[in-house]
Amino acid sequence: MFLGLTATLPMLATRRTGARADEGTPLHPGPGHVGPTNLITDVTGLTVGEAHDARSRTGVTVILPDQRVACAVDVRGGGPGTRETDALTAGNLVRSVDAIVLSGGSVYGLGSADGVAAWLGARGRGFSMTKQPGVPPSPIVPTAILFDLANGGDKHWGLNPPYRDLALKAMDHPSRRVTLGTAGAGYGAQAGALKGGLGSASFVTADGLTVGALVAVNSLGSVVVPGTRHFWAGPFEIGREFGGLGASAAHVDPEDWGRAKLNPAARANTTIACIATDADIDADDLKRVAMMAQDGLARAIRPVHSPFDGDVIFALSTGHHSLPPGPRPLHVARLGALAADVLARAVARGVYEANLPPGMDGPTWKSLPG
């Protein structure tokens, strides 16, 4: 399998002697561009549903493929909260999903998957070992949650947390439009000391592959360089999608975390995300893409993957676009590298677009001086 890759890479290296002399090769087929809407839904076959509860300051986001799709997950945070991620492990029977849920609410938010599963099951969607009258399918709805319980919202819900109902509301009108910032799973999120939010971005390669990301940013770490308004993700910005400040020239003290959260608590922080592509790759390939996409969090948040975070990344493929000619591992590497860059941009966009919900205090990125 690796002979073709070994033979290809030296050839590419010999051709990379001038400015973009490698264009037209499998490594760099030519300049790509941001997708039409710069959202995860630029990936063919996806819609997104969102809902929030302003009183509780929490929300739910659902990524809905038009059919079951291959999926993988990579968990890096020290305090994750997930549902059905084991189903995506190599060697297991079901490595495809009917939907992905990102939710606020910590452990209570895992109940949002109940609403999505009910919605899907009522429409006959799900995994079926047998098709018999009266035997419903089992929708596969992996879910990741973030902690927004201490943001000042009213969490006195007793025996009836709102997440199942929020999920059903999100499924009322799934759309290709995605509200960024204070919306969905990012409604009550906090990114370090700044208001966090829901972010998305996309990229289309010259040979037609699309990669998109959707992320709820609720990190311990800071998304900006200490003492500045510059996003850590600045070098990866395309156009002015999150302010246009670009990279910072500031020297960074290794022990200065800048606008990180003070006095972090275990499982009180988390960045949860979904990567999507239309490239026709399988669950094993998607596992590598999810792993590589974690680099995007490291590019956009400092620190990240701490004992206090529950960082989780799903990666799915709608399979609408065949891989171009060339070694498959090379294309997987390309997709993983793109996923990391797109996710870094999505993180910054989520915080850039965030505003304070009614009654909530604290700084937003737009309120920073300078």
Task: Name each region found by the language model.
Residues 24-107, 111, 122-370:
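A structural signal for small-residue-enriched, beta-sheet-centric alpha/beta enzyme cores
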Residues 1-21:
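N-terminal export signals
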Residues 114:
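Glycine-rich loop at the start of a catalytic domain that most often binds anionic cofactors/ligands
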Residues 117-120:
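Active-site-surrounding "flap" and adjacent substrate/cofactor-binding loops of secreted or lumenal enzymes
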